[in-house]
Amino acid sequence: QISAGLLFQKNTDHTDSDLKRLQESAEQKAIDFITFLPEMRRILSTDVTAMYNGDPAAQNKAEVILCYPAIRAICNYRIAHKLLELDVPLIPRIITEMAHSETGIDIHPGAVIGEYFAIDHGTGVVIGATSVIGNKVKLYQGVTLGARSFPLDENNNPIKGIARHPIIEDDVIIYSNATILGRITIGKGAVIGGNIWVTENVAPGERLVQAKAKP
């Protein structure tokens, strides 16, 4: 599959020497990926622990692993992210979109996500390509970590490769349907309430909630 991805990316006629180099590159990437699997398993175990500890409805970790759609999405993301780090084309996005179609959770493989990551319920969660998420972060359903705007080039096309999504520091909780846009920072230990639109930095430990309706 890695070889196929590399061939697809080249999209040109290949000489025998080209094919040999691509095959050697694919084999090395596969070896590097396999070597990383024990560490990936360790990281995924922290995600399972976070999901189990944070959900009183979870009876055991086996239930979390087998039944929770967020674990499927996070597992696919962690596989895809490592492949992307190894410069494997196309396949990482296919892997995360498979989880997206099955779970309703859209995590771009380019996002950087720390350990003990939890998504509760999960439907409608969107995590953009340049998002950075620290350790022990919990998101609820419908959360969007998105971009606020796209700088355009001289042809009015969006400029690619610019950091445009939020930075979420350690120990942050973001409740359902919160929308956080742009390259802003949500500080360590902050709590973002549900149904809130955030476009500015949030200080560490701050609690941001909707204003109470006036009588």
Predicted regions and their residues:
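Terminal amphipathic alpha-helical/low-complexity segments used for targeting or macromolecular assembly
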Residues: Q1-I94
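Structural signal for interior beta-strand "rungs" in well-ordered beta-sheet cores
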Residues: A99-P215
